[in-house]
Amino acid sequence: MRPSKRTPAQTRPITITRNFTAHAEGSVLVEFGETKVLCTASFTEGVPRFLKGQGQGWVTAEYGMLPRSTHSRMDREAARGKQSGRTQEIQRLIGRSLRAAVDMKALGENTIVIDCDVIQADGGTRTAAITGACVAMVDALNWARAKNIIKSNPLKFLIAAVSVGIYKGEAISDLEYLEDSAAETDMNVVMTETGKIIEVQGTAEGEPFSHEELNELLGLAKNSIREIVDVQKSALN
């Protein structure tokens, strides 16, 4: 039995609130149960130096956790003077995932910077961030089209992400912290709205897992992501 009494395939209640802040071209508060992440998308003209003159755009991401997003306060990384390896890994994952969803030529020489700030953490912050950031990015792209900065829609498809894992011998979806911290296997899956895989991060925390268990986890993720994309589409409509 899961701590939350959810069924193995059941995600937490998911809500996406658009236009959560006033200034960003796209802004979203995404909530997976008690995990809450603010995602903003800033549209800027110009690209990094390595892309200048190539007629294509760029999407990049930053990620951070507020000091009291966790059970006990942690220092701000700015105060420590450097980002942790975890932070760097997560923001690269977010950036890679979102770039897969965008036609960079259609974006032109423009950049979208995604900022994901975890307000409250209860497991699955990176997958929630990807899910919310995609919606914020859609709003930023629509803003640019409305301003005639770009002519066509660079979005190829929606993407979303979910955590899956093996907890007490059972494959489960959308792990909260109590499950994540005790899982035998922990996996983060990013997919397109049609179920194609963008990224899989999987680790045997306790016991090695089999090919059959891997396939079961990917099937679980695919079904959950289909539901999450429905939430994204509902928010965008």
UniProtKB/Swiss-Prot annotation:
GO BP term, pick one: tRNA processing
Function text: Phosphorolytic 3'-5' exoribonuclease that plays an important role in tRNA 3'-end maturation. Removes nucleotide residues following the 3'-CCA terminus of tRNAs; can also add nucleotides to the ends of RNA molecules by using nucleoside diphosphates as substrates, but this may not be physiologically important. Probably plays a role in initiation of 16S rRNA degradation (leading to ribosome degradation) during starvation.
Ligand binding (phosphate): R86, G124, T125, R126
HAMAP family: RNase_PH
CDD domains assigned to the protein according to its UniProt record, in alphabetical order: RNase_PH_bact (cd11362)
UniProt family annotation: Belongs to the RNase PH family.
Enzyme Commission designation: 2.7.7.56
EC top class named in words: transferase
Reaction(s) catalysed by this chain's protein: tRNA(n+1) + phosphate = tRNA(n) + a ribonucleoside 5'-diphosphate
GO MF annotation terms: 3'-5'-RNA exonuclease activity; tRNA binding; tRNA nucleotidyltransferase activity
Organism: Shewanella denitrificans (strain OS217 / ATCC BAA-1090 / DSM 15013)
A Pfam family matched in the record: RNase_PH_C
Protein name: Ribonuclease PH
Quaternary structure annotation from Swiss-Prot or TrEMBL: Homohexameric ring arranged as a trimer of dimers.
Keyword field: Nucleotidyltransferase, RNA-binding, rRNA processing, Transferase, tRNA processing, tRNA-binding
Gene3D superfamilies attached to this UniProt entry: GHMP Kinase, N-terminal domain
InterPro entries: ExoRNase_PH_dom1, ExoRNase_PH_dom2, ExoRNase_PH_dom2_sf, PNPase/RNase_PH_dom_sf, Ribosomal_Su5_D2-typ_SF, RNase_PH, RNase_PH_bac-type, RNase_PH_CS
